[in-house]
Amino acid sequence: MTVHELKAQLRSADLEEFVDKVILTGDSPFFSSDQIRHVSKTLASKYSIEMDSMQIRVVGSAKLGYGLFKKRTKTGDYLAAFRPFRPESDIDLAIISPRLYEVIWDELSIHANNSPWMPWDSGRLGDYMVYGWLRPDHFPKYARLRRCDDWWDVFSALSSDSRLGRRTIRGALYHSLDHLRRYQIRGLNQCRADLEIQT
């Protein structure tokens, strides 16, 4: 799909159908099903859960071939919206697993209950959690939480794995496929609004 074809679809397509048929279905041209199985096996081993208790979807530019939104880099520069996927681009994975979600949620709940104040200030972690999404970059930074730390250890190791191309791999954890689907639809609606402003 060319960038012009993608923009045309985002302007006119039924976005729920687009999410179901394009984003949540089919393979990524940049991350193979064998590589996905390797990630699944690694997570299952680390967290002592069954592989079939999770699903993994490639999302973002590694699925569509283009990054839909402007992105700020660590240096403060901005990468343009609809930039093509490049060999050095991150691989974004959505991990869908009620079991794994509850394992990490339970650890966060114990941490919150051990805090001296209530409600515990979850920061932006809670803002995303209400959408059924645990964002690892918002895990508590000043607490040693084993299951949360395990997440970073797993994805750090995966990012340096030659079988996965030694490129940055990021994982976001969703409670269900419906939670991921709703988030993707919301993002595409925002993308459509941005495109309409440009026309």
Task: Describe each region flagged by the PLM.
Residues 1-89, 96-199:
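Catalytic core of pol beta-like nucleotidyltransferases
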